[in-house]
């Protein structure tokens, strides 16, 4: 399951997480099955959070590079 989660896109993981939450909210699953689905949901949540953090870090880096490039351009004009 862990390898499968790493290969999933963020959107796929989110869709699967939503499905698990819906199944758990129905409340008609046996305890063992509910626990298994809950564990899967937690793993997907962590994986998705990591993907979001990586995306945020990439955006921050790109914006910093752009700002740095703009600062250098402004310095050359003066």
From Swiss-Prot:
Localization per Swiss-Prot or TrEMBL: Cytoplasm
A biological process term (GO) from this entry: DNA catabolic process
Example GO molecular function: exodeoxyribonuclease VII activity
Keyword hit for Cell membrane: no
Keywords: Cytoplasm, Exonuclease, Hydrolase, Nuclease
Top-rank EC class of the record's enzyme: hydrolase
InterPro entries the record matches: Exonuc_VII_S, Exonuc_VII_ssu_sf
GO cellular component terms, semicolon-separated: cytosol; exodeoxyribonuclease VII complex
Matches recorded under Pfam families: Exonuc_VII_S
Enzyme Commission number(s) of this protein: 3.1.11.6
Reaction equation(s) it catalyzes: Exonucleolytic cleavage in either 5'- to 3'- or 3'- to 5'-direction to yield nucleoside 5'-phosphates
Cytoplasm found in the keyword field: yes
Major subcellular location class: cytoplasm
Function: Bidirectionally degrades single-stranded DNA into large acid-insoluble oligonucleotides, which are then degraded further into small acid-soluble oligonucleotides.
Family under the similarity heading: Belongs to the XseB family.
Cited NCBIfam families: PRK00977.1-4 (NF002140), xseB (TIGR01280)
Assembly with partners or alone: Heterooligomer composed of large and small subunits.
Protein name: Exodeoxyribonuclease 7 small subunit
Species whose genome carries this gene: Idiomarina loihiensis (strain ATCC BAA-735 / DSM 15497 / L2-TR)
Gene from which this protein is expressed: xseB
């Amino acid at each position: 399951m862990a390898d499968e989660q790493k290969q999933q896109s963020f959107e796929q993981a989110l869709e699967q997480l939503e499905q698990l939450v819906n199944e758990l909210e129905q409340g008609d699953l046996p305890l063992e099955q509910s626990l298994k689905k809950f564990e899967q949901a937690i793993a997907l949540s962590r994986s998705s959070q990591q993907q979001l953090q990586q995306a945020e870090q990439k955006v921050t880096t790109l914006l910093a590079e752009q700002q740095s490039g703009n600062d250098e351009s402004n310095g050359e004009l003066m």
